[in-house]
Amino acid sequence: MLFSKEEYKNRLKKVQKSMQEKGIELLISQDTNNMNYLTGYDAWSFYYTQCVIVHVNAEEPLCFVRAQDAGGAYIKTYLKRENIIIYEEKYIHTWPMHPYDPLIELIKKNKWEKLNIGVEMDSHYFTAYCYEKLKQGLPNA
């Protein structure tokens, strides 16, 4: 890690404070810079679906990555192993499956599907298709 665990915790608290001020209960961050800022994750696999999920009251964010990139997340982040969420490679380029399918299931499993969710609409790899998958998969969010 380039920074201390305490530094990352302070960054998380700042983001959560901003989320509270904006009424956001769950943040899905796909921007690689923001993912790195929050966790230290810096893999050069940004062209595949990956994100950091921040619950407004969580002690740690979740890092959602493909199986092949999990090793980098274990090494480069301060996160506990259980907060690195791995999706299977079968979701990559196998339409109609998409990596947001297990992301949506993760959100439902944690009972977050009715929360006010914030996303980065100007993030380079957060496509209109990703946005539509979230809207369709989480209609009550």
Placement of each model-derived feature along the sequence:
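A composition/biophysics-driven feature that prefers long, compositionally simple stretches
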Residues: 1-141
